[in-house]
């Protein structure tokens, strides 16, 4: 095998169009991201049809910019990695069809990547010496998982949400208190002005050994609190609501992740996904893990949000295991972690 394996990666699962060139799964030569946040902000959330059209408009330019920034041509690429699920089906298809076209035209192998696996792999970019096994908390707008990474590309899901993802709950609560979209960063910001002990919102407790999550109850409790105060004409302190809600979510995420570490006897927790940029989650997880002697690894913001570099990292580890993807692959919007 060559000393350096160069992956051209493409990500388009939601509202970011991204392309990257990644060497040996850990060195990023380029990571171009065209965000659609300003487009969807006025709608209060991502509109799938609009997202697909925006991907189509920019994908060629984004891929070319990634190659140019890396000072590469397609001849320098060993394989093409692309997200094929989970995500919005129309958005996924744009990136997938583009990648399939490149693979067909160049004869380069295609490697389909699970978006969640990509988020986990972002940690290999930031932490060059990181090796499995370790625990990973994946928290984003669409996904919440506790994953035990046994080996490269080999996962065991120990806990997942039974309803809303953590990021989804953040977005809905932010909308309810008039903060708009995207909700996560806005709740994080306003919470710094509030009292996290002001309101006691419930935490889901399944009363058994499960490490699963449920955030719909917390979200509903916030909405009920707001409705009751409004009906009585009472003043609502949005900062207190945001801070108390955030603490409820973060406490559950941290508690379950530490329990998972203890159950598997691992001393490293990696964090992945857009919600990993939340300051309360970062501070609470680091503080509580320190008490247990557990190391916490959190990539920088650019690697927490959707990006193609993480897809390139995951694709590399698939490549060296000899895994290749047929050109007849289709988008799988509900793809499960570990499915191939």
Curated annotation (Swiss-Prot):
Gene Ontology terms: cellular component: cytoplasm
Reactions accelerated catalytically: L-threonylcarbamoyladenylate + adenosine(37) in tRNA = N(6)-L-threonylcarbamoyladenosine(37) in tRNA + AMP + H(+)
Major subcellular site: cytoplasm
Recorded family membership: Belongs to the KAE1 / TsaD family.
Protein name from the UniProt record: tRNA N6-adenosine threonylcarbamoyltransferase
Enzyme Commission numbers on file: 2.3.1.234
Keywords associated with the record: Acyltransferase, Cytoplasm, Iron, Metal-binding, Transferase, tRNA processing
InterPro entries, alphabetized: ATPase_NBD, Gcp-like_dom, KAE1/TsaD, TsaD
Purpose of the protein: Required for the formation of a threonylcarbamoyl group on adenosine at position 37 (t(6)A37) in tRNAs that read codons beginning with adenine. Is involved in the transfer of the threonylcarbamoyl moiety of threonylcarbamoyl-AMP (TC-AMP) to the N6 group of A37, together with TsaE and TsaB. TsaD likely plays a direct catalytic role in this reaction.
Note accompanying the cofactor annotation: Binds 1 Fe(2+) ion per subunit.
Biological processes per GO annotation: tRNA threonylcarbamoyladenosine modification
Pfam families, alphabetized: TsaD
Species in which this protein is naturally found: Clostridium botulinum (strain Loch Maree / Type A3)
Cofactor: Fe(2+)
Gene coding for it: tsaD
Cellular localization per UniProt: Cytoplasm
List of residues binding Fe cation: 115, 119, 306
Record-listed substrate binding positions: 138-142, 171, 184, 188, 278
Molecular function terms, GO-annotated: iron ion binding; N(6)-L-threonylcarbamoyladenine synthase activity
